């Protein structure tokens, strides 16, 4: 949940990942999820949140009817995941990408997992804040969040360094036998010949494979346009596309109805 100022406008946006975690004996997950959706929608409506986004549900049709009842509309989205169990991630890389990674290493690029009190973490947060400054849906505001995440056993923050400077970073979560990449940012233009984005993603994939995780899911592969450089970049690592719904609720009713008609008629 974050606020964004785009003069002369200011708005709030909330992004919810997944339907939550339930005890193994729970059978009525969709009913519980519907209560959560109603409660969070009412709360954010009072806070004048411009739009709410829900993504990465466990199945495409999970909660469909309940989300519709609460004023949400779906947009077809492409979800990408890499399998880490049948082959090593290196075997899935095309030769061109292998060469890029080799060149980056030869030129001095190194990847590491950063600690909560390290200068590398502060550099990584600064890099993400700069990288996402013109991307309203991915705004990075508070470094305290990342300091907290860096202490969690379920999260790792990777940093690609060159001459003691962080030139690429990503944030990954680990849960239920799978890995999830949340944020990815790099200085790909300033350090083009070091391929910082590629090296950062590769470092996270390699770590997840070495730790025995089955899949790496990319939580945001970009907007669902026919030509999407971010999606093509991620697919280059040997991943697969799976269609899913991403749900939205817009505070202004007529805009929400128009968007629903535009994407679903």
Predicted feature residues:
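A conserved beta-strand-loop-helix scaffold within acyl/acetyltransferase catalytic domains
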Residues: 1-5, 56-193, 223
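Aromatic (often tryptophan-rich) hydrophobic motifs at membrane interfaces
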Residues: 2-3, 11, 22-26, 34-42, ...
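Acyl/amide activation-and-transfer machinery of modular secondary-metabolite enzymes
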Residues: 10-21, 75-81
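Short, polar/flexible loop-turn hinges at active-site or ligand-entry regions and domain interfaces
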Residues: 23-30, 87-92
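Divalent metal-dependent hydrolysis catalytic cores, especially in the metallo-beta-lactamase
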Residues: 48-56
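Short secondary-structure transition/capping segments
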Residues: 64-66, 123-127, 228-231, 254-258
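Membrane-proximal basic amphipathic "stem/tether" segments
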Residues: 248-265
């Amino acid at each position: 949940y974050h606020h964004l100022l785009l003069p002369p406008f200011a708005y709030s946006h909330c992004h919810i990942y997944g339907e939550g975690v339930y005890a193994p004996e729970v059978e009525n997950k969709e009913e519980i999820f519907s209560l959560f959706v109603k409660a969070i929608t009412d709360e954010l409506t009072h806070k004048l949140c411009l739009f709410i986004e829900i993504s990465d549900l466990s199945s495409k049709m999970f909660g469909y009817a309940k989300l519709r009842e609460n004023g949400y509309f779906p947009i077809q989205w492409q979800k990408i995941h890499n399998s880490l169990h049948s082959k090593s991630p290196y075997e899935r890389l095309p030769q061109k990408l292998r060469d890029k990674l080799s060149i980056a290493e030869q030129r001095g690029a190194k990847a590491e997992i950063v600690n909560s009190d390290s200068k590398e973490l502060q550099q990584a947060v600064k890099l993400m804040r700069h990288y996402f400054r013109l991307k309203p849906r991915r705004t990075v505001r508070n470094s305290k969040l990342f300091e907290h995440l860096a202490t969690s056993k379920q999260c790792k923050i990777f940093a690609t360094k060159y001459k003691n400077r962080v030139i690429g970073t990503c944030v990954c979560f680990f849960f239920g036998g799978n890995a999830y990449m949340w944020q990815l940012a790099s200085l790909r233009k300033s350090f083009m010949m070091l391929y910082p984005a590629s090296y950062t993603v590769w470092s996270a994939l390699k770590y997840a494979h070495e730790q025995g995780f089955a899949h790496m899911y990319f939580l945001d592969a970009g907007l669902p346009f026919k030509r999407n450089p971010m999606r093509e970049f991620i697919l280059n690592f040997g991943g697969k596309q799976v269609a899913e719904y991403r749900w939205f609720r817009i505070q202004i009713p007529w805009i929400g109805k128009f968007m629903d008609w535009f994407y679903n008629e």
